[in-house]
Amino acid sequence: MTAKEMAMQTITMDAAKAHIGFLASDELRGRKAGTNDSKVAAQYIKSQLRQWGIAPLADKYEQPFSAYSMEWQKKKPYYVEPDSVAKLKGMTHRKLNMYNILGMIPGKKTDEYVIVGAHFDHVGYDPDLDGDQIYNGADDNASGVSAVLQIAKAFVESKTVPERNIIFAFWDGEELGLLGSKYFVQTCQFIDQVKGYLNFDMIGRNNKPENPAYMVYFYTAAHTAFGDWLKEDIQRYGLNLDPSYRAWDNPVGGSDNGSFAKKGIPIIWYHTDGHPDYHQPGDEACKINYEKTRDITRAAFLNVWNLANVESY
């Protein structure tokens, strides 16, 4: 068994249950961006990276940023773009302080990067609801965070130095308009040296109960190798996945992949489609398909291995 294959085996259902169980617990009250509950989630992520010896991207794991909205109304958009923020600061009614969490495993080529990411915020809680008031966000997106964490640990376990730097990114403010990933892309001094971005958003459920292995695999159409990789790995490693392959000419929508696609960076996005509990209190950890979450995470680990080590794609 190769180092890659042994590392893949460290990705387990038990680890997914532990990560999702904590992040989607009632104690975190839905991890709304800009709240102490979201900060607890960020501290948990940071503690995992530190425990595994994964260094921060910069001098610390947190990348702080602020977002501004013109009014207090819930539906008003938030802005992190420098030009927009400069115009809004004088008349803003609301400011949110948030931060991304960023870790990195250095590669041999210090001037090339790949990024694997997921947002850790959700939509909080509603004290006016009858019954369950907490939007736990197990699928959206504790499931995706668990995948990035397990992939980070698997690379450590591989004891292999990748060809390219691998950044493990946990975005804040996605539910308010991809704010964390937008800020990262706009301020990243090496953005033109990022060779690929892999995104997770909702990988633990699906809307096809008759086919629990169903998932959606979005990727930049010009990079046909991305589709080939998944097909080959499902067959080679017996992963119980039934992907709908979505080659996308301009993959700018849906999730944090859009922030990178707008810069022309090739993307892969794992997703298991919508369901009735989307942005509802019913998005609970007990409803996650942990076998599928594990197999998606293993498939994505193999993707990231290729992104970090294959010469061209």
Where do the PLM segments sit?
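Acidic/His- and Gly-rich active-site-bordering loop/insert found
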Residues: 23, 49, 91-127
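His/Asp/Glu-rich mid-to-C-terminal helical/loop segments that flank catalytic regions of hydrolases
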Residues: 274-313
